[in-house]
Amino acid sequence: MTTYQVRLINKKRAIDITIPVDENTTILDAAEQQDIELPFSCQSGSCSSCVAKVVEGEVDQSEQVFLDEEQMAKGFIVLCVSYPRSDCTIRTHQEPYLV
């Protein structure tokens, strides 16, 4: 199993932490295991509570059903069903910016 380094950032919330995330673990689950509090609700990829934005790197969020193609093209992801596919940097708490 491959483990990636995922950097979670948000200047407004003073978040800048890098955590190890196994390829078969969602980024949200890994953050919870590290006692990092991130917003979430459904945990099934069908709402916008845990929306984040990929700054760098690649994730697999093929299980999500909420975001449209345009939003995904802009880098938006839902953390509850996002699995890292490379080392990456992710901006958290992005629900207010989802248009």
Curated annotation (Swiss-Prot):
Name the record gives this protein: Ferredoxin, vegetative
Superkingdom, taxonomy of origin: Bacteria
Residues of the 2Fe-2S ferredoxin-type domain: 4-96
UniProt entry tagged with the keyword Electron transport: yes
Organism the protein comes from: Trichormus variabilis (strain ATCC 29413 / PCC 7937) (Anabaena variabilis)
Cofactor: [2Fe-2S] cluster
Family (UniProt): Belongs to the 2Fe2S plant-type ferredoxin family.
Listed CDD domains: fer2
Gene Ontology terms, MF aspect: 2 iron, 2 sulfur cluster binding; electron transfer activity; metal ion binding
Keywords, sorted A to Z: 2Fe-2S, Electron transport, Iron, Iron-sulfur, Metal-binding, Nitrogen fixation, Transport
Cystine residue pairs: none
Record-listed [2Fe-2S] cluster binding positions: 42, 47, 50, 80
PROSITE patterns xrefs: 2FE2S_FER_1, 2FE2S_FER_2
GO biological process entries: electron transport chain; nitrogen fixation
Cofactor note: Binds 1 [2Fe-2S] cluster.
Keyword Magnesium included in the entry's annotation: no
Gene3D superfamilies with a match to the protein in the record: 3.10.20.30
Pfam families associated with the record: Fer2
Biological function: Ferredoxins are iron-sulfur proteins that transfer electrons in a wide variety of metabolic reactions. Donates electrons to the nitrogenase 2.
